[in-house]
Amino acid sequence: MAKEEEEFKATMKIEILEEDKFKVRFILYDAPIAFANSFRRAMKSLVPVMAVDYIDVYLNSSYLFDENLAHRIGLIPIKTELDRFNLPENCVCGGEGCPNCQVSFRLNVEGPKVVYSGDFVSDDESIKPAFDNIPIIELFKGQQLMIEAVARLGTGKEHSKFQPVSICAYKIIPEIDIKDSCNNCNACVEACPRGVFENKNGKIVVKDVLSCSMCMECVKSCEEDAIELTETNNYLFTVEGVGQLPVKKVMIEALKIIREKASEMNKLIEELV
């Protein structure tokens, strides 16, 4: 087992295919499927980000109940600086609340107007809603809101509002072997719903292996049994961020967390042995 782990360490790598502010597509090469799934789970559930934990409502003359407002406000993504704040359970204040683990936002608005996330005023200029144009409620004439919201770090394992990514999925990239017995009948080209194959100069070839979903329609359609699909240790990931952190930062933090957890497990095993 140790030898297999060393082989994976030596060959495992990531290739970025597509990257923008909110989305990254990449290939994870030569990794066990257990690691690929751990990576996915860590990005979604273990990387901490800021979100509103609770609100104090001083005045609400709108048509919406306080708890409905709290729910909407809690789901607003907030820009996060992990190097400046602690998780409540790791803070010197013991989770009671201090500038090292929480930030307060104030909202004081009067209708008629649509209240947006950008109307909140933060105690910390660098910690604010990731988007200013998220609508919260429409106030009519005479209606008013006075609210203080307190944000802290948390993880998606605790609540979905702390998830730094929305889409975080991977699929296995197969190895597709077209044997010499192929008679180039085009049956696989017509059967494949994703356009993986093409007839090039009278010969069937793989055009886009990354689009393959391993639905096996090509194998079923081939009367010559000339197509063989084999699972590999390569995975195509698609990750979309919510806005609190850059997606690449989420990836890096997730890998750090996996390493820390692996180190903790090694220590526990050594103690038992």
Where are these regions (language model features)?
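Protein-protein interaction/assembly regions in multi-subunit complexes
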Residues: 1-273
